[in-house]
Swiss-Prot record:
This is ESX-1 secretion-associated protein EspA. The lineage of its organism: Bacteria, Bacillati, Actinomycetota, Actinomycetes, Mycobacteriales. It is found in: Secreted. The gene is espA. GO terms for cellular component: extracellular region. Residues 334-344 have a biased composition (Gly residues).
Length: 392
C-alpha cells in the first residue's frame, strides 16, 4: 500500500481526464485561413468587375445586379468562414484552458505528496495525520478539475449551437445559390428552346413561301404558254374554234376535282362537217386548198339532176360528168387563185364535151334508143370514175 494512498489515486484520475481532452495542441482554425483568403480574393475581383461609367444601359444594370449577387454570396461565405474560424479557435482555447487547469491540479497534488508520505512515518498516528493532510488537497484539486470540465462542457455546448446556426446559414446560402444557378440554367434552356422554336417556325414559313412562289411560277408559266398557244390558234383562220375544247385542260390545274367530260365537251366541233371546208385557208393555197367543200359538191349534183335530158341517156351521163369536171376545176381555181395547187385545173371546153358525148354514143356502149344500155364507166377527171346505168 502506497503511503500517499489518497493523492496517488487522485493524480491517476486527473491523468485520465487529461487524456480525454485529446493529444497534442488543439487546432486554432488555421486550416480555414486558406479558404478565407480565397473568398477575400474573389471579393476583390468581383468588386473590380463592376461596370464603370463607360458602360450604361439595361445590359450593364443586369450585369451589375448579377455581379452584386455574387459579391453578396461570397461576402456571406467569407463571414461564415470567419465565424467558423472564431468558433474553432474559441473551442480550442477552451480545451487548452481545461488542460492547463488539469495540469495545474496534478502538479499541486504532486507537490504535497512528499509531505503526506513523511507523515506516515510518525508512530501510531502517522497514517491518520497523513490521511487528514491528503484529503483536503485532493478534494480541492478535484473541485478545480470539475470546474474546468464544467467550463469546457458549457463552452462546447455554446460553440456547438453556434456551429449549428452557421451550418443552417450555409445551407441557406447553398440552396439560394443552387436555386439561382437552376434559374439561370432554366432561363438558358428556355432561351435555347425559344430560339429553336423560332428557327423551326421561320423555316416552315420559308418553305411555305417557297412553295407558294414555286406554284405561282409554274402556274404563271403554264398560263403564259397557254396564252401563246391560244394566240397561235387564233391567228390561224378556221382554227379559232379548235381551242374551245383544249381550253378545258386548264381546269385540270385549277379545279378541285377532275371530270372525265370537262375536256371533251367540245370534241364534236373538231369532227363537224361544217368546219371542214374552212380548212381551205390553211397554208395560203397548199394542202386541201384545191378541194371543193361538201356543200358545193352536193349543190352541183342537185342542179345537175334537175337539168332536162334532151340528149338522151348517154348525153345526160356525159353532160353530168362534164359538169362535175367543170365544177371541180372552178372550185380549184377559186381556192388556189389560179392553176397553182392540186385542185387548180382549167375549165373543160365545149370541144372536150362534144368528144366525150361522141365517145359514149359509139362503140360497145352504143345501142338503140328503146333498148337498155349496158353500164358505162366514165372518167370524171381527177381519177374519179362514175358508173352510169340508165333505163329508158
Amino acid at each position: 500500500m502506497s503511503r500517499a494512498f489518497i493523492i496517488d489515486p487522485t493524480i491517476s484520475a486527473i491523468d485520465g481526464l487529461y487524456d480525454l481532452l485529446g493529444i497534442g495542441i488543439p487546432n486554432q482554425g488555421g486550416i480555414l485561413y486558406s479558404s478565407l483568403e480565397y473568398f477575400e480574393k474573389a471579393l476583390e475581383e468581383l468588386a473590380a468587375a463592376f461596370p464603370g461609367d463607360g458602360w450604361l444601359g439595361s445590359a450593364a444594370d443586369k450585369y451589375a445586379g448579377k455581379n452584386r449577387n455574387h459579391v453578396n454570396f461570397f461576402q456571406e461565405l467569407a463571414d461564415l468562414d470567419r465565424q467558423l474560424i472564431s468558433l474553432i479557435h474559441d473551442q480550442a482555447n477552451a480545451v487548452q484552458t481545461t488542460r492547463d487547469i488539469l495540469e495545474g491540479a496534478k502538479k499541486g497534488l504532486e507537490f504535497v505528496r512528499p509531505v503526506a508520505v513523511d507523515l506516515t512515518y510518525i508512530p501510531v498516528v502517522g497514517h491518520a495525520l497523513s490521511a487528514a493532510f491528503q484529503a483536503p488537497f485532493c478534494a480541492g484539486a478535484m473541485a478545480v478539475v470539475g470546474g474546468a470540465l464544467a467550463y469546457l462542457v458549457v463552452k462546447t455546448l455554446i460553440n456547438a449551437t453556434q456551429l449549428l446556426k452557421l451550418l443552417a446559414k450555409l445551407a441557406e446560402l447553398v440552396a439560394a445559390a443552387i436555386a439561382d444557378i437552376i434559374s439561370d440554367v432554366a432561363d438558358i434552356i428556355k432561351g435555347i428552346l425559344g430560339e429553336v422554336w423560332e428557327f423551326i417556325t421561320n423555316a416552315l414559313n420559308g418553305l411555305k413561301e417557297l412553295w407558294d412562289k414555286l406554284t405561282g411560277w409554274v402556274t404563271g408559266l403554264f398560263s403564259r404558254g397557254w396564252s401563246n398557244l391560244e394566240s397561235f390558234f387564233a391567228g390561224v383562220p378556221g382554227l379559232t374554234g379548235a381551242t374551245s375544247g383544249l381550253s378545258q385542260v386548264t381546269g385540270l390545274f385549277g379545279a378541285a376535282g377532275l371530270s372525265a367530260s370537262s375536256g371533251l365537251a367540245h370534241a364534236d366541233s373538231l369532227a363537224s362537217s361544217a368546219s371542214l371546208p374552212a380548212l381551205a385557208g390553211i397554208g395560203g393555197g397548199s394542202g386541201f386548198g384545191g378541194l371543193p367543200s361538201l356543200a358545193q359538191v352536193h349543190a352541183a349534183s342537185t342542179r345537175q339532176a334537175l337539168r332536162p335530158r334532151a340528149d338522151g341517156p348517154v348525153g345526160a351521163a356525159a353532160e353530168q360528168v362534164g359538169g362535175q369536171s367543170q365544177l371541180v376545176s372552178a372550185q380549184g381555181s377559186q381556192g388556189m387563185g389560179g392553176p397553182v395547187g392540186m385542185g387548180g385545173m382549167h375549165p373543160s371546153s365545149g370541144a372536150s364535151k362534144g368528144t366525150t358525148t361522141k365517145k359514149y354514143s359509139e362503140g360497145a356502149a352504143a345501142g338503140t334508143e328503146d333498148a337498155e344500155r349496158a353500164p358505162v364507166e366514165a372518167d370524171a377527171g381527177g381519177g374519179q370514175k362514175v358508173l352510169v346505168r340508165n333505163v329508158v
